Structures are given as C-alpha cells and as structure tokens.
C-alpha cells in the first residue's frame, strides 16, 4: 500500500501466477481479494487484522500517534516467530516531511528520504524467561 503527499492511496496486489493489480483501498494484510488458503488465513489472522485496520482508520478522531500504537499490539503485532510468522517492525512514513520511523515496541529509529544514513539496530523479538521464551 502506498500513499502520496496529497493523501491518495493504492494497494498493489502481486502474485507469481497473475498480473499485478492496483486496488484503491487504504489497507492490506496477508491475503488479496479473497482468502485462498483458509489455514494460513486463520494462522495469520489476516481477516481479523484487515477488519481491525479498516475500523481503525474510519475513526474520525484517529491520530497518527494512536494508529502507530495500534501496530505495536495484537491483533496487528504478532510474535509467532517460533511458528514462522511475526512482526519484524512497523514502518511509519511521513511523506510530507520525507521521513520514516522504524518502530518496535521498545525502540524506534528515524531516517530521511533525502539524507539517508545507514544505521545498525539490534532488537530483541522474543525475550527469554528462564528456559522459555515470553510471549
């Protein structure tokens, strides 16, 4: 999903066995037009996450900061890493300022589109608790 400075958005669906398709919707998750693999959709909560996003952005008092916070907790934030699925980071683009924030629950970094400087960042995705990993 992309957004320009005027606020216009589009989502591009790409797949190996069909042509790319531009859809004018503001959100995207782990499925395209419809679910094609029920087990994967259930595992990733793709339908729930899409509905959550659509409901969130329809709220008239939604702020940028509150939307970003929603990406850092379920259902949008997932920690099923040991099962092969999870949120690695959230990217919050500010196209008017030409900046991006890369965000984790306990850390964030910023970068400029025009004066990009490479950064090295270490994050802990799952914290060990005794012999086990916390969820």
What would you call each of these model-derived segments?
Residues 1-135:
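C-terminal, well-structured catalytic/ligand-binding subdomain of enzymes
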């Amino acid at each position: 999903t992309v957004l320009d400075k005027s606020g216009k958005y589009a989502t591009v669906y790409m797949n190996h066995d069909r042509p790319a398709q531009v859809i004018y919707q503001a959100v995207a998750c782990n499925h395209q037009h419809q679910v094609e693999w029920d087990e994967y959709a259930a595992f990733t909560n793709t339908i729930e996450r899409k509905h959550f996003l659509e409901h969130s952005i329809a709220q008239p008092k939604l702020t940028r900061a509150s939307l970003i916070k929603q990406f850092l907790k379920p259902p949008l934030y997932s920690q099923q890493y040991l099962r092969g699925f999870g949120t690695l980071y959230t990217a919050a683009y500010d196209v008017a300022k030409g900046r991006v924030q890369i965000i984790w629950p306990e850390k964030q970094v910023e970068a400029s589109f025009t004066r990009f400087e490479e950064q090295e960042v270490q994050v802990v995705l799952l914290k060990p608790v005794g012999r086990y990993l916390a969820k």
